[in-house]
Amino acid sequence: QAKEGLARAGFAAAAGICILAVALICVFLFANGVPAISEIGVVDFLLGTKWKPGNDIYGIFPMIVGSIYATAGAVIVGVPSGFLCAVFLSRFAGKGVGRFLSNGVELLAGIPSVVYGFFALMVFVPFIRNNLPGKGMSLLAASLILGIMILPTVITVAKSALDAVPKRYYEGALALGGDHERAVFGVVVPAAASGILAGIVLGIGRAIGETMAVVMVAGNNAVIPESIFSGVRTMTANIVLEMGYAADLHRGALIGTGVVLFVFIL
């Protein structure tokens, strides 16, 4: 009983530390960001289309739009591929192929974001610049690399959800005359829908919060993009690019951007 009580105390302490960390982050963000937002004006801050710190003009609407567009592009690129890969690994791949691909997915998850950004800078940006409109550093380049970066999250969570579906569901579908593909997509996938959706949501959170790779390839123009070939600046990129030299209201506006980003992720 003493060991059990000690274990419970340890688990409770770990949970308390996690809760305290989240609470402290919230307190820091809101205590420093909300006053700046109030001073600027909520409407001017959220819907303003100009970001000019030198003139004390802080409108983050272009960054909000940029974050939404980049995340939407990442979802379009990464979610279908990740979902189909998860289905293949869970229900179609043999043991050898499945193990090899699973190791590859784990490797993707461990690659630093700066390496992804360097890859996009060396591959995607020149390709877009030489074959498509624009200068290469664009919303399209950011969306492509973000789509690749969310693949491990989507694949891993979706595969776990598919693996957790009881075998009797699949066997029952076969007993009713369905073939393998129909049993998988008609019975197993719907049964795992909540877990697959969780993987997609986690992938979206990863895309919204990603910074370094986006900074390297997005162009970082603080304007609303006119097309996928235009440069774009996300909220995270805005914070990283300017926090090093920001002061006073400028610094508060950047922390306020963090508040908006925090609400987005929630």
Where do the language-model regions lie?
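Periplasmic/extracellular loop-to-transmembrane helix junction in inner-membrane transport proteins
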Residues: 2-10, 30-74, 94-95, 241-252
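Amphipathic cytosolic juxtamembrane alpha-helices at the membrane-cytosol interface
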Residues: 4, 81, 85, 89, ...
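Cytoplasmic-entry segments and transmembrane alpha-helices of multi-pass inner-membrane transporters
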Residues: 8-9, 81-120
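N-terminal signal-anchor transmembrane alpha helix
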Residues: 14-31
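Hydrophobic positions within alpha-helical transmembrane segments of bacterial inner-membrane proteins
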Residues: 20, 67, 71, 75-83, ...
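Generic hydrophobic transmembrane alpha-helix motif, especially the helices
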Residues: 106-147
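Transmembrane alpha-helices
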Residues: 157-158, 180-216
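Interhelical loop and adjacent transmembrane-helix boundary motif
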Residues: 214-262
